[in-house]
């Protein structure tokens, strides 16, 4: 069992999702309002991915906003990044060094992804 598993498990429980032990290196949670949240462990990094399908008419504006808001000078405390999957799926993500991972940092990263998603989708 990795030392960060209890942190990830507690985070999932805080979101109302029970977990089993041992945790998979890829956890996928369906969020009612914000799409799919994935937590992926790879090497010494934990990446949080927030993916949401958009209507075709939202895609261009969302892509421009996401890239603008995640530019290095505007990314804030955590290095948030944006990407696109397929024809209509906005993907926002942040990679965290496992050595500095704490439960508050995990919550902060998730909250920043949610805020960024709201900003990107705002009219």
Swiss-Prot record:
Q: Which domain of life is it from?
A: Bacteria
Query: GO CC terms on record?
Result: cytoplasm; plasma membrane
Enumerate the CDD domains for this protein.
T3SC_IA_SycN-like
Impact reported for residue 77 to T = In plasmid pYVa127/90
Q: What are the entry keywords?
A: Cell inner membrane, Cell membrane, Chaperone, Cytoplasm, Membrane, Plasmid
One biological process GO term for this chain?
protein secretion
Among InterPro entries, the record links this protein to: T3SS_SynN
Q: How does it sit in the membrane?
A: Peripheral membrane protein
Give compartment(s). Cytoplasm; Cell inner membrane
Q: How does it assemble?
A: Interacts with YscB to form a complex which specifically binds to YopN.
Under the heading NCBIfam families, the entry gives: type_III_SycN
Q: What does this protein do?
A: Functions as a specific chaperone for YopN. It could facilitate the secretion and the subsequent translocation of YopN.
Name listed for the protein in its UniProt record: Chaperone protein SycN
